[in-house]
A protein has these predicted regions:
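A short glycine-rich beta-alpha junction/loop motif
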Residues: 1, 34-62, 217-224, 254-280
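A short beta-sheet element
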Residues: 1-21, 37, 169-170, 189-245, ...
Length: 329
């Protein structure tokens, strides 16, 4: 259904936008939903919803909700840029070997100073039956990173109503949050607890590689938590992410209802790894991109939580404006 305003008014349009996103309106819709295959609501029921008066308090609250949404949008755009830059650098340095090829041809590598260019060799050698930059090694993903599979968490129920960890399954990984998640025990081994910034890889069903920023949770089966004591987070995250298309291709050809990969595929997936010294120097360029991306994603989550706490009060009016402004500041 599309709303058309007889007398365009941006303030009123924004107000109705947020009213229609409020939990009170969603509850109203749920109580009047029709159909089974396709749930819908009648035009009469929609038009019968009683919209609270547009007071100065609600006007100010809408302004704050608009500001929150604007901040979220800018942070998401920034994160998309940070991710794109990190992936581009990784592909150029560790897949296409652009700096090495440039030096081999007697050219200065593009986009880097002399000190950075000096980190890359000027030729190739064979490693694991493939050419890699001289002094580097072709290595399997699971040779430098640990892929910890999650638990069947139905065997670890929560201790109580207020003492639990939300269960992170594929659905939560894709959504980036733990809303409506199952609950598990808080007494799991530490390695099965997921925290902001952890790298998660769903290896079955819908294959995804993500930097988790949805708050503390419990690692469910069919998800790997990826860690390493040998290489930095940015490297094993981008290396795993680089191989995701081929992992999806493998899973798509599995003769089962739920395509997946096996650990042998982690062993078969190779990437060129430089010396620890070179990797440490390159970390100075890429790690800040990933760290800022994580920091921004946590901010987005916090803004979303704030928005969700404000929305019910837009209708009820049960919040002083000074409190709202303090929350958004």
């Amino acid at each position: 259904m599309k709303l058309q305003f007889l007398q365009p008014n941006k303030e009123i349009e924004n107000y109705l936008y947020w009213v229609l996103r409020s939990p009170q309106y969603r509850e109203y819709c749920a109580g009047r939903a029709m159909g089974s295959a396709v749930v819908a609501m009648s035009r009469e029921d929609f038009l019968s919803y009683e919209v609270p008066p547009f007071t100065s308090f609600r006007s100010n609250t809408v302004d704050l909700l608009e500001e929150i949404e604007k901040r979220e949008r800018l942070l998401r755009e920034t994160n998309a840029t940070l991710e794109a830059i990190a992936r581009t650098l990784f592909k150029s340095w560790f897949v296409d070997f652009d700096p090495v090829r440039a030096k081999q041809e007697g050219r200065a590598p593009e986009g880097m100073d002399e000190a950075t260019a000096a980190l890359f060799p000027d030729g190739f050698e064979e490693s694991e039956q493939r050419l890699v930059p001289r002094g580097w090694r072709a290595r399997s993903l699971d040779s430098f990173a640990d892929y910890l599979n999650g638990l069947a968490l139905q065997k670890f129920p929560a201790e109580g109503e207020d003492e639990y960890l939300p269960v992170i399954k594929i659905a939560q990984l894709r959504a980036g949050n733990t809303q409506n998640a199952d609950r598990a025990s808080t007494k799991l081994k530490a390695e099965y607890v997921v925290r902001d910034g952890d790298v998660l890889f769903s290896w079955s069903g819908s294959l995804e590689v993500e930097l988790w920023c949805g708050g503390e949770g419990a690692l469910n089966q069919h998800l790997f938590k990826v860690t390493s004591s040998e290489v930095p987070k940015w490297f094993y995250y981008l290396a795993t992410r680089h191989h995701l298309p081929e992992f999806r291709e493998i899973a798509a050809h599995k003769a089962t209802t739920m395509g997946h990969i096996q650990r042998k595929h982690l062993t078969e997936a190779k990437i060129a790894v430089p010396s620890p010294e070179v990797l440490t120097r390159l970390t100075e360029f890429v790690a800040p991109l990933i760290e800022l991306r994580i920091e921004n994603a946590v901010r987005i989550r916090s803004l979303g939580e704030l928005r969700d706490s404000l929305l019910p009060r837009l209708i009820s009016g049960q919040l002083r404006l000074s409190e709202v402004e303090a929350l958004v500041a």
